[in-house]
């Protein structure tokens, strides 16, 4: 017996297509942080809802921001933080 979904999932939309004035720039780290995890990984477009074009641009700008040290490459491990606090 198959169960029907009670509701349809909300369709995701590209934030940058909806707002043409919103720039994707490596200097705008506050916007770029919305598209990376707390561990520093880039979130997939099927999760964020961005279109293919803007996901490519977003990935390029995140990588530029990492090189300029505006964003982190990876998060520090909690075990590393504990070791430093003991010493």
Curated annotation (Swiss-Prot):
| Annotated GO MF terms | small ribosomal subunit rRNA binding; structural constituent of ribosome
A biological-process GO annotation: translation
Look up the domain of life of the source. Bacteria
Q: Name one Pfam family in it.
A: Ribosomal_S18
Question: What SUPFAM superfamilies does UniProt report for this protein, alphabetically?
Answer: Ribosomal protein S18
Tell me if Nucleus is a UniProt keyword of this record: no
**Which Gene Ontology cellular component terms are annotated?**
cytosolic small ribosomal subunit
Which of UniProt's keywords are assigned here?
Ribonucleoprotein, Ribosomal protein, RNA-binding, rRNA-binding
The UniProt family comment states: Belongs to the bacterial ribosomal protein bS18 family.
This protein's assembly is summarised as: Part of the 30S ribosomal subunit. Forms a tight heterodimer with protein bS6.
Explain the purpose of this protein. Answer: Binds as a heterodimer with protein bS6 to the central domain of the 16S rRNA, where it helps stabilize the platform of the 30S subunit.
Q: What is this protein called?
A: Small ribosomal subunit protein bS18
Q: Which organism is the protein's source?
A: Nitratidesulfovibrio vulgaris (strain ATCC 29579 / DSM 644 / CCUG 34227 / NCIMB 8303 / VKM B-1760 / Hildenborough) (Desulfovibrio vulgaris)
């Amino acid at each position: 017996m198959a169960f029907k979904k009670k509701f349809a999932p909300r369709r995701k939309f590209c934030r940058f297509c909806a707002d043409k004035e919103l720039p994707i720039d490596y200097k705008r780290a506050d916007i770029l942080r919305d598209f990376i995890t707390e561990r520093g990984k880039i979130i997939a477009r099927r999760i964020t809802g961005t279109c293919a074009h803007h996901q490519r641009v977003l990935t390029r700008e995140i990588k530029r921001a990492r090189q300029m040290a505006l964003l982190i490459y990876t998060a520090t491990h909690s075990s590393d933080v504990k070791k430093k606090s003991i010493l």
